[in-house]
């Protein structure tokens, strides 16, 4: 009798494992971001200036800046440029947090400038559209979230195009 129980238990464990794995959606990290390479004639410094100008024109404040590559270089680690820019409209951020404090984990909006091994730079941000769709926001907050998404993409596009 014990011989039958072991295979049955093992079979049940395998079936349960397969069910759990099938029921758990996998998330490809690449699907959660938007990437925009800089145009060939756009320097990294011009891209940064363009993003800052566009953000200012759209009333989004640059609330934080992290030149990660400088920190790495100060530790003796070779690094191409890795710079993280954080933009925010404080009023919208507060409204989102008031609705659901979990949104605070996604604030402020971040754009990373990443210089590749070939010197080509890319701007990368979280795909806000992916999260907006699943957030079950009331209509007024949905409108504001879409505005944030569009503004961040506009800031990125200005940087990618060198739109001074």
Language model features with spans:
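Positively charged n-region of N-terminal signal peptides that target proteins for export
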Residues: 1-5
């Amino acid at each position: 009798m014990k011989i039958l129980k072991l295979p049955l238990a093992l079979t049940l464990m395998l079936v349960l494992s397969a069910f759990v794995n099938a029921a758990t959606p996998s998330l490809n990290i690449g699907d959660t971001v938007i990437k925009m390479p800089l145009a060939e004639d756009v320097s990294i410094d011009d891209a940064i200036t363009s993003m800052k100008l566009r953000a200012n024109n759209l009333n989004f404040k640059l609330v934080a800046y992290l030149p990660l590559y400088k920190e790495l270089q100060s530790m003796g680690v070779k690094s191409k440029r890795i710079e993280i820019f954080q933009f925010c409209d404080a009023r919208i951020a507060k409204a989102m947090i008031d609705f659901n404090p979990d949104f605070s984990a996604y604030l402020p909006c971040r754009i990373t400038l990443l210089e590749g091994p070939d010197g080509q730079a890319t701007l990368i941000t979280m795909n806000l559209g992916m999260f907006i769709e699943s957030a079950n926001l009331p209509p007024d907050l949905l409108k504001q979230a879409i505005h944030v998404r569009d503004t961040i993409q506009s800031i990125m596009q200005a940087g990618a195009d060198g739109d001074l």
